[in-house]
Each structure stands twice: as structure tokens, then as C-alpha cells.
Amino acid sequence: MADKMADIKSISIATGVIILNLLLGHFFAPTGIMLTPVALIIATVLIVFGTKDLKPIFITLAILGLIIFHDVGLKLYSGGTHDRQGLGWLHLMLFMGLIPSYILTVVGIVRNKKTNWTEKSISIIIFPLLMAGHLYLFSDLGLGRHYWYDWN
């Protein structure tokens, strides 16, 4: 029971980090975009090393869910004018956080002694496949939006 509470706590804190960064991006642009790598790495570390009872597939899906939530949130609600130049910058910051997040996820999954290699392999392979699918479908999401406040 204590491990399940630790898992819930880690995932909740990781979600809070992502939401905080999205709020920073909305109200204090471009801070949220610039802190994307930091937020993604912190969320990944919290989930990979802070959970004890989750299977590798659920670890991968939880991390991917938060990364995709962060990406969609920034593309739709980040402050400023959303144009192609900003989208390129956002994708650069996304990949600067995505690569270390993937490496940390692989390390955490491989270190897990409770599961077999088939499940570990599937968990490692679906991360880039699902992320590539997301970027293929939603790479232009949010173009043309405009959010502006006097203080940013």
C-alpha cells in the first residue's frame, strides 16, 4: 500500500511540474518554452525513479502522456503569437528535453528486475513510435493563435 501511495505521489508531483510550466508559459511567455527541457526531465526522473509498483509499459505511457500533455498545452495556450518560427523553437526545446527523458526512461526500465525482457523491449520501443505519431499528427497544432498580456 505504501508503494502505491509513493507511485501516486510521484506521478502527482510530476503532473504538477508540467502544469506549473504550462502556466508559466501562458502568463510569462516565453519562460514556459525555455523551461521545457527542465520540466520534462524533472517529470521523467520523478516517474522513473519515484515509482516502485508500476510496470514498465505504464511508466512509459505515463511519461509519454505528460510529455504530450505538455506539448499540446504549450502549442495551444502559451503566450505570444504562434507562428512557424515559434513552433520551430518549441520543437527544439521539446527535443532537448525529449532525448534525456528517453534515455532516463530506458535506464529506469532496464534496471527494473521484476519484469521480463519482452515487456521491457516493448516499453522501450513504443516510446519513440508513439512520440513520432504524435508529432506527425500534431506538429502544426496551435499555429495562428495569439495570447498577449501587458507584462510579457
Briefly describe each language-model feature range:
Residues 1-4, 15-29, 50-58, 82-86:
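Short juxtamembrane and helix-loop transition motifs at transmembrane-helix boundaries
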Residues 6-22, 59-67, 127-130:
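Alpha-helical transmembrane segments
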Residues 21-28, 71-83, 137-145:
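Juxtamembrane "helix-exit" motif on the non-cytosolic side of transmembrane helices
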Residues 22, 29-43, 86-101:
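Alpha-helical transmembrane segments of polytopic membrane proteins
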Residues 37-61, 69-75, 104-108:
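Canonical alpha-helical transmembrane segments
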Residues 71-109:
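Short alpha-helical packing/oligomerization segments
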Residues 101-152:
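C-terminal membrane-adjacent module
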